[in-house]
C-alpha cells in the first residue's frame, strides 16, 4: 500500500472498461472500515453509472470531462440522516443540528472517501477526487 500511495496521481482519462459491481461493492465494503465519529458513519455514497445522469451531474462539477468520461462516478456525502433515524427509533435525541454535526459528518465522509480511493488504487483503478461537490452541493442534492 505504501508504494501505491507514493506513486498515486489523479487520473483524468479513463478506458471504456466497466467496473464490475462485485469489485465496486468490495471497495465500498472495505471503505466502511474507515475511522469515523463514534461509529455513527455520518456519510452516504451515491453511485452513478448511467450516462444521462452523469451528464446531469457535469455542470455541478464545472463540466470537467472526468464526470462523463469515467465508467462510474461516486459522490461522497456528509449525511447524518441515518443516525438521526436510528436515534428516533430509540426515542433518543440525536442533537444533530449544529456546527459539530457538520464537522463530524464532513470528516466521516472524507475519511470514507479517502479509504475508498486508496482501496481502488490498490486494485489498479485510476481515480480523480473532485472537490467540486462542496462548491455546488445544492445542484447535486
Which role does the model predict for each range below?
Residues 1-141:
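Acidic, surface-exposed loops and disordered segments
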